Amino acid sequence: MQIITQKIAPCLWFDSEAEEAAKFYVSVFKNSKINTVGRYPDEGQEIHGKPAGSVMVVDFEIAGQKFVALNGGPQFTFDEAVSFQVYCESQDEVDYFWRRLTEGGKEGPCGWLKDRYGLSWQVVPVALLEMMLDRDASKSARVMAAFMQMKKFDIEALKRAYEGETV
C-alpha cells in the first residue's frame, strides 16, 4: 500500500468536524473521495482529550488533490491568510461552486467566500486570469475596477469591462 502519493498535502485543523467537512468537500468536487479515517486511541487522552474511537484524521482528495482533516480541538481556527482557489472555465461552473461553497457560509468581495466551516475559498474564472495578464494595462485596470465591485464574479461583465464597454 502506498501511503504518500504527493509531496505536500494541506492539513486542515478542525475542532470536531473533520469527517463532516471532508464528506461535504467530496460532495462538492468531482474526482474526490475519502481515502481513510483514523480514530483516536485510548492512549494519550490526558493530552488530546478526545474520546477513544472518535475521528482523529481524515485522509481525502478534492479534485485529485490530497488533503488531511484533523480534529485537533478549538485551539486554532481558519482565517483568510490561507485560502483555496477554485479555477472555473464557465459562468455555470462559477455559479455552481459559489452556491455550494456558500451553503451555510458567507459571501465576501472579489470572488472570496467562507464556507460553513470557516475555510476561505476564491472562486476564480480562468478568463479573469487571462484578462488580468493582458499587456494592455488599461484593459487589466478596467477589469480590476469591475471585479472590485463584485462578490461572485460575473464573466460577461468582466469581458465587457475588458473591452471598454460600460459595466
Language-model region placement:
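Short coil/turn motifs at beta-sheet boundaries
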Residues: I3, P51-G53, T77-D79
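Core segments of cupin and vicinal oxygen chelate
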Residues: L12-G64
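Vicinal oxygen chelate
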Residues: M1-I3, N35-T36, E61, V68-G72, ...
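Short loop/turn microsegments at loop-to-beta-strand junctions
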Residues: A9, V55, G108-C110
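Residues that form or flank phosphate/diphosphate-binding pockets in enzymes
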Residues: E20, D79, D92
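Short, solvent-exposed beta-strand edge segments and adjacent coil->beta transition regions
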Residues: T5-A9, D79-S83
